[in-house]
């Protein structure tokens, strides 16, 4: 990914933890009450399958060999074998597969070695395994799955970002979509913006995401409070929508339905 400081072409010294080091550190910190769980991510080492196997082994050793009862979140490698991802889900509380960018075009331009179809297929397989486990009352990624979108590395507006999130929630039953504001990096590609987006944009997207998941708003309704497909950075999206829909107010709390009360 051209926007990542740890990309393959980046001129930085590489380092890694062995499975034993990850397990040892996690157990030691957990026993001292420094941590409540482990979030484990990795660049690709040797191959997607090798990397996914190493992550799965770390989680398995924690559970089986050390009786680790803390939270484990594994960042799965979408190109890895479905079997390895399934094995990881047996030991992790949550799996996540990064969608990275809101559009296929942006992914091709800024992360050419990643394939949107492969990412979505892997997310679909995780959802299937989670649904099967619920029906059979067995353990598989009980805290569900999540994903992440980089915001501001491409030209996509907030309407596109939220529309993608809405599809992800509906199609893959995600628990969360995380938004990460693009941060300029040294020796970056000319395809990337020179400046980072306003940090407030990330905050507004998280607020909008809450409206999407719990308040019954559609992406178009949410962005209608701003201009040009972007959220208003000065006021929260719920207030922005209300100001653009003054005809819906005031509301009589004694007779209004739940949907209107939420808004």
Regions found by a protein language model. Name each.
Residues 143, 204, 254-257:
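N-terminal alpha-helical segment
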Residues 120-126, 155-237:
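A structural motif corresponding to the C-terminal lobe/cap of the Radical SAM core domain
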Residues 236, 240, 248-263:
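Helix-hairpin-helix
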Residues 1-4:
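Short cysteine clusters
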Residues 70, 143-145, 172-175, 208-210, ...:
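Structural beta-strand/beta-sheet cores of well-ordered domains, especially the beta-sheet scaffolds
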Residues 6-147, 151-156, 168-169, 183-194:
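Conserved Radical SAM active-site core
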